[in-house]
C-alpha cells in the first residue's frame, strides 16, 4: 500500500524574514508545519547570525528553487573594525586586535577593489563540501583544506556609514558570494581587521522587501485565525507568491490548450519564437497558466525540462 503523503497540496513561495539565531532548516520546518504543506524547500541558507529574506518554496514550487539559488542577492552588513575572528563573524573567537587608523581615502579605495568581477576564496567556515564534508567541520577540528578561488560579481558596493568602530555597507552580488570573506579581506586591506556583527539579506532576485513575513507574524496570524474560528490557511495562503515568480526572468512561450496534453506527457511540441540554448517559461491558453520550463531541442521543437503536476482539483477549478 502506498504511504499517504503528509500535509496538504499547496504551491507557492513564502518570503520569510528569518530571525537571528535560528538555522535556515529550522525556519523551513516551522513554515512547512504552519502551512501544513506536504513539501517544502528553501533557496539558499542564511547563517544563524544573519537575518532577512529566505524564500521558502512549497509544493510544486520546489521544482524551481534552484533558479532562486542562482539569483543575485542584496545584503546590508555591519562590520566591527579592529578585531579579526576565526570565523569572520561575531560567532567566532577573536584572534587578533589592532588599532583603527585608516583614512577615508583608503576606505574608499579599498571598497573599489571589491566591485565588479573578482575571484574569492571561500571561508573555511562555510557549507561548501570537501570529500563529502562541509568545510566548517574541518575548521572546527583545526584542519585547513585547500580551496580554489571562485568567480563572483559585486554589482554594487555602497558605503552607508562609519560610526565609531562599526562600518555598514550595502552589497548587491552574484550567487556564491561570501559577505564574511569580503568583510575579512576589507579589514586586512584597512590594516585593522574586521568581522561581521550584523548581516541582513534584503533581496533575492527581484522579490520585494515589503512582502517578507517573520515566523512571529505567521504564528500570530495562526493564533488569531484560531481565535476567530477560521482555518489558518485562509489567512496564510494569501501570503504566497505564485511559483512562476521563481522563473520570471525567463521569456514566456504561450501554447494553445490543444498542445497541453502532449507537452504534459513529456513530448516536445511546435512553438514559434524559440532560440537555441534559451530556457523559456511555458504557459497554456488564454489564461496563461504556468506549467513549467522548457527549451528548444535539436529538432527545433519546444521540449519540456521541468513541469509541474496539475492535480485533479486544479483541473476542475
Swiss-Prot record:
Keyword terms: Isomerase, tRNA processing
UniProt-listed Enzyme Commission number(s): 5.4.99.25
Function comment: Responsible for synthesis of pseudouridine from uracil-55 in the psi GC loop of transfer RNAs.
Gene3D superfamilies: Pseudouridine synthase, PUA domain
Coiled coil spans: none
Keyword check for Transferase: no
Molecular functions per Gene Ontology: RNA binding; tRNA pseudouridine(55) synthase activity
One Pfam family, short name: TruB_C_2
Tagged with keyword Membrane: no
Catalytic activity: uridine(55) in tRNA = pseudouridine(55) in tRNA
Record family assignment: Belongs to the pseudouridine synthase TruB family. Type 1 subfamily.
Protein name listed in UniProt: tRNA pseudouridine synthase B
Cited CDD domains: PseudoU_synth_EcTruB, PUA_TruB_bacterial
Highest taxon in the source lineage: Bacteria
A GO biological-process term: tRNA pseudouridine synthesis
Active site residues of this protein: 47 (nucleophile)
Amino acid at each position: 500500500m502506498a504511504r499517504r503523503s503528509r500535509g496538504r497540496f499547496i504551491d507557492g513561495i513564502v518570503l520569510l524574514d528569518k530571525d537571528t539565531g535560528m538555522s535556515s532548516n529550522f525556519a523551513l520546518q516551522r513554515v512547512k508545519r504552519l502551512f501544513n504543506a506536504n513539501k517544502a524547500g528553501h533557496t539558499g541558507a542564511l547563517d544563524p547570525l544573519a537575518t532577512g529574506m529566505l524564500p521558502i518554496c512549497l509544493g510544486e514550487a520546489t521544482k524551481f528553487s534552484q533558479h532562486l539559488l542562482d539569483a543575485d542577492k542584496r545584503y546590508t552588513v555591519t562590520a566591527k573594525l579592529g578585531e579579526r575572528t576565526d570565523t569572520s563573524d561575531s560567532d567566532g573567537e577573536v584572534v587578533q586586535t589592532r588599532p583603527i587608523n585608516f583614512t577615508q581615502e583608503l576606505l574608499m579605495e579599498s571598497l573599489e577593489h571589491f566591485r565588479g568581477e573578482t575571484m574569492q576564496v571561500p571561508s573555511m567556515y562555510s557549507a561548501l563540501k570537501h570529500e563529502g564534508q562541509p568545510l566548517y567541520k574541518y575548521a572546527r577540528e583545526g584542519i585547513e583544506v585547500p580551496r580554489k578561488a571562485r568567480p563572483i560579481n559585486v554589482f554594487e558596493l555602497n558605503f552607508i556609514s562609519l560610526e565609531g568602530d562599526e562600518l555598514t555597507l550595502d552589497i548587491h552580488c552574484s550567487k556564491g558570494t561570501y559577505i564574511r570573506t569580503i568583510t575579512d579581506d576589507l579589514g586586512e586591506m584597512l590594516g585593522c581587521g574586521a568581522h561581521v556583527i550584523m548581516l541582513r539579506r534584503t533581496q533575492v532576485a527581484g522579490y520585494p522587501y515589503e512582502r517578507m513575513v517573520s515566523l512571529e507574524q505567521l504564528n500570530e496570524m495562526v493564533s488569531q485565525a484560531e481565535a476567530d474560528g477560521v482555518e489558518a490557511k485562509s489567512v496564510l495562503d494569501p501570503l504566497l507568491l505564485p511559483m512562476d515568480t521563481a522563473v520570471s526572468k525567463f521569456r514566456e512561450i504561450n501554447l494553445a490548450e490543444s498542445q497541453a496534453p502532449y507537452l504534459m506527457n513529456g513530448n516536445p511540441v511546435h512553438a514559434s519564437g524559440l532560440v537555441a540554448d534559451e530556457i523559456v517559461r511555458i504557459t497554456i491558453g488564454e489564461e496563461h497558466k504556468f506549467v513549467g520550463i522548457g527549451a528548444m531541442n535539436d529538432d527545433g521543437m519546444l521540449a519540456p525540462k521541468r513541469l509541474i503536476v496539475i492535480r485533479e482539483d486544479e483541473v476542475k477549478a
